[in-house]
Amino acid sequence: MGFSPKTLVAFCWTVLFIISFVHCLPMTHGGKPGYGIERTIIRPEWRCYVDEGCPKGQGAPCEKNCKNVADYGICIGIKCCCFDVIPVPPT
């Protein structure tokens, strides 16, 4: 028995979906995908500065400015903080 074209197409889409999902996961300090097991803690080497847009809820300029020095940017209160790994808050 062979595989029908419908089965092959479904299999290929499934493989493509799984590969793209794993590829898009945030990276941890060890350089492997973050599956939610390891938690990132706030590190002192974060670079933070006061940003006028953060209190107004405008995080896009913060993200854009941080791309020059790090991977991500996030507004924390009135400060924009740049960092290299997406933080996971402790539960």
Swiss-Prot record:
Disulfide bonds: C48-C82, C54-C75, C62-C80, C66-C81
Lineage: superkingdom: Eukaryota
Major subcellular site: secreted
Subcellular location: Secreted
One Gene Ontology cellular component annotation held by this UniProt entry: extracellular region
One BP annotation, GO: defense response to fungus
Keywords (A to Z) from UniProt: Antimicrobial, Disulfide bond, Fungicide, Plant defense, Secreted, Signal
Residues in the signal sequence: 1-24
Assigned protein family: Belongs to the DEFL family.
Protein name from the UniProt record: Putative defensin-like protein 104
Organism: Arabidopsis thaliana
